[in-house]
Amino acid sequence: MKITKITSHVLGYDLPETLGYSQQYYKKRTSHIVEVETDEGVTGWGECFGPGNIAFANKGIVEKVIQPIVLGMQALDRDVIWHKVYNLMRDHGQKGMPLQALSGVDIALWDLAGKAANLPLYKMIGGAHRDKVEVYGYGMMLRPENIKSLISRFKEESAEIKEMGFKALKM
């Protein structure tokens, strides 16, 4: 099952307000989805981390750097592919955008392998270590506001998250 094409899809939408976290504020939410196609018609999907315009830079790395390296390779040779790409890109950085782009391709190859084997991924990586996973509520994004307003809003939002039944939250 050979890799025939890799396509990056950058999705985005404008937020109704400016939001932020410890590193930056942003007005648009983006997601970078990677699609790996094979000669047998099996397709795998992955996601690259990279907020904002970083998603477009990662798209270029996936399509212009990684794709030419892996076209024609066996899609099930995930480890071989990962090390080949990593070793060819490592002079350009062992973290950040090159690894974000590689991770999206790697996730897509795992998805593809699970589909080809007709197995869920947890079976392919050694089985289920638990039968449930606790989830957390998410919120309390930064906004351009004064600290007093921020504290008040965080108290309200955390109470709302707790009322929804979450036992933990991420901010």
Residue spans for each PLM region:
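Structured beta-strand/loop patches that form or line metal/cofactor-binding pockets in enzymes
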Residues: 1-45, 49-52
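Glycine-rich, charged/polar anion/phosphate-binding loops
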Residues: 18-21, 120, 155-156
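Ligand-binding pocket scaffold of soluble enzyme catalytic domains
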Residues: 34, 45, 77, 116, ...
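Metal- or metallocofactor-binding catalytic centers and their adjacent structured scaffolds
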Residues: 37-116
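Glycine-rich, aromatic-flanked loop segments that form ligand/cofactor-binding clefts
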Residues: 106-146
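Metal-dependent enolase-superfamily TIM-barrel catalytic cores that perform enediolate-based chemistry
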Residues: 131-171
